[in-house]
């Protein structure tokens, strides 16, 4: 199924995923497309931050759902 990931810059990334995919898997796919390391990614759906070990099905994320990607930047100001 396809889902969409919207970044803070307003860009929308389309991903091909399965309901059984873990959030880790989704972050790896985002890394493949965008080059953003998974440890800097925070995914939000329906106002909730998604935990790495859970699956898309756990959060009732269905086809054509839109997730929001927030970057967690490391250290320094």
UniProtKB/Swiss-Prot annotation:
Subcellular localization(s) per the UniProt record: Cytoplasm; Nucleus
A UniProt-annotated Pfam family: ubiquitin
Record domain Ubiquitin-like: where: 1-76
Chief place of localization: cytoplasm
InterPro entries documented for this protein: Ubiquitin-like_dom (IPR000626), Ubiquitin-like_domsf (IPR029071), Ubiquitin_CS (IPR019954), Ubiquitin_dom (IPR019956), Ubiquitin_ubiquitin-like (IPR050158)
Gene Ontology CC: cytoplasm; nucleus
One MF term in the entry's GO annotations: mRNA binding
Keywords noted in UniProt: Cytoplasm, Isopeptide bond, Nucleus, Ubl conjugation
Proregion residues excised on maturation: 77
Organism domain of life: Eukaryota
Record-listed cross-link Glycyl lysine isopeptide (Lys-Gly) (interchain with G-Cter in ubiquitin), residues: 48
Location in chain, cross-link Glycyl lysine isopeptide (Gly-Lys) (interchain with K-? in acceptor proteins): 76
Function: Ubiquitin exists either covalently attached to another protein, or free (unanchored). When covalently bound, it is conjugated to target proteins via an isopeptide bond either as a monomer (monoubiquitin), a polymer linked via different Lys residues of the ubiquitin (polyubiquitin chains) or a linear polymer linked via the initiator Met of the ubiquitin (linear polyubiquitin chains). Polyubiquitin chains, when attached to a target protein, have different functions depending on the Lys residue of the ubiquitin that is linked: Lys-48-linked is involved in protein degradation via the proteasome.
Entry similarity comment: Belongs to the ubiquitin family.
Protein's name in the database: Ubiquitin
């Amino acid at each position: 199924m396809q889902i969409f990931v919207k970044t803070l810059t307003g860009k929308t990334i389309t991903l091909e995923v399965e309901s059984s995919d873990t959030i880790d898997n989704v972050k790896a796919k985002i890394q493949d497309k965008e080059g953003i390391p998974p440890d800097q990614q925070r995914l939000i759906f329906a106002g909730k931050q998604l935990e790495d070990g859970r699956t898309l099905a756990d959060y009732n994320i269905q086809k054509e759902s839109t997730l929001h990607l927030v970057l967690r930047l490391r250290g320094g100001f």
